[in-house]
Amino acid sequence: MNSIIELTDYYSSNNYAPLKLVITEGKGGKVWDTDGKQYIDCISGFSVANQGHCHPTIVKAMTEQASKLSIISRVLYSDNLGKWEEKICHLAKKDKVLPLNSGTEAVEAAIKIARKWGSDVKGITDGQVEIIAMNNNFHGRTLGSLSLSNHDAYKSGFHPLLQGTKTVDFGDIEQLTQAISPNTAAIILEPIQGEGGVNIPPKGYIQAVRQLCDKHQILLIADEIQVGLGRTGKWFAMEWEQVVPDIYILGKALGGGLYPVSAVLANNDVMRVLTPGTHGSTFGGNPLAIAISTAALDVLKDEQLVERSERLGSFLLKALLQLKHPSIKEIRGRGLFIGIELNTDAAPFVEQLIKRGILCKDTHRTIIRLSPPLVIDKEEINQIVAAFQDVFKN
C-alpha cells in the first residue's frame, strides 16, 4: 500500500490530499483496500455511486455498447441519444437537455445559458449580466464555477475571475432580495449544500426564492449534481419544497459510477438561446456515455432506489440522533445524505470510523458527511450506527 501511495504522490499534481488508503475493489455499498479489508462506503465518490459500485446492469450496458460504438461526436446522430434525452426530459419535466461530461462543465454551460438569456431575452446589456450564488456553495473549480464561490482559499491566485457575480448567505431571503438588481439574470443554488456541510435551508426558503425569480424575471438554477437522482430521498432535492427551477444541472450519479456524464435541462424559452456554434462538447452525449446513463437511470427507477434512500435515510438519521456526546453540535440530513456537525475537529473521529470499517470524510473541518450508495441495506446501516456509537463512546 505504501509503495502505491508513494508512487502516486511522486507523479501526481499536488491539488489533492487523499486519505492514506488504497482502494482496489468495489461492489454494491462496499469497497476493499489492497490488504483485503472491507469498508462500507459512506463517500460514494461524493454521490457518484448512488447505484452502488459496479452495478451489473450498468456494467452490462457499458460493455455491450463499448464493443459496438463508443464515440462519433455530435456532428452525427447516434441511435441512442434521442431515447435518453426523452427519458431524462420527462423525468425533469423539461423540454430540452444539453448532454455534457463533468459537473463543473455543466455549471459552466448553465452560466453561459443564463448570461445569453439575460442579454437576448431579458434585454440586459451584454457584459452587464449578473448572477447571484450562495455563500458556502460548491459548483466546481473551473474558472466560471469558481467565480460563484465565496471561498478565498479556492480563488486565491486565480484572478481575474468572471465579473458580475455576487454571493449571499444561504437561507437569508432578505439578503437575497437586497442583492437583486435590474441586471440580475439568474440565481444559482444547491437545494441542499453538499460540500458546504449538508446545509438544509429553512422551510419555505426555496419557495421564496422561486417567488423572487418570478417577480423579477430571473432564472432559478438548481445545481443538483450531488443532491439529485435520489440522494436526498427524492428524484430532485427541489421536490422537498415542490419547487420547479428554470434550469436543472445534473451529474455524478447520472453516469452510474462508471462514466462522467452531466446535463443541463431547461424549457424551450430558455434553451433556445443556444444555436449552432454557441456551445459544444466533443464527448458530451457520446453513445457510450448515453448507454451507461440510460442504464443508470433505469436502475434508480426499477430498483426503487429513490424511495429506498428516503426510507433508509430516515432510519439512519433517527439512529444517529440518539448519539449523545459533548462534541456533537448538530445532526441533520435528508434521505441518505447526512451531516454530523461537531464543535471540534472531525478528522480524529473520521480516522476512528475508518478503522472500524466505515469509509467517510470530513468537510469544512468540523462536519462528517455521510452519503452511502443507495443500494445499502439495513444490516449495513446498523453497522454504521454501531461504529458511530463505539467511536463516540470511546
Curated annotation (Swiss-Prot):
Compartments it resides in: Cytoplasm
Names of the cofactor(s): pyridoxal 5'-phosphate
Keywords: Amino-acid biosynthesis, Aminotransferase, Cytoplasm, Proline biosynthesis, Pyridoxal phosphate, Transferase
Known EC number: 2.6.1.13
GO molecular function, one term: ornithine aminotransferase activity
SUPFAM superfamilies: PLP-dependent transferases
Superkingdom, taxonomy of origin: Bacteria
Principal location class: cytoplasm
Residue numbers of N6-(pyridoxal phosphate)lysine PTMs: K252
GO CC terms, sorted: cytoplasm
Catalytic activity of the protein: a 2-oxocarboxylate + L-ornithine = L-glutamate 5-semialdehyde + an L-alpha-amino acid
Pathway in which the depicted protein is active: Amino-acid biosynthesis; L-proline biosynthesis; L-glutamate 5-semialdehyde from L-ornithine: step 1/1
Pfam families recorded: Aminotran_3
Main enzyme class: transferase
GO BP annotations listed: arginine metabolic process; L-proline biosynthetic process
Role summary: Catalyzes the interconversion of ornithine to glutamate semialdehyde.
Family recorded in the similarity comment: Belongs to the class-III pyridoxal-phosphate-dependent aminotransferase family. OAT subfamily.
Name the record gives this protein: Ornithine aminotransferase 1
Chain's gene name: rocD1
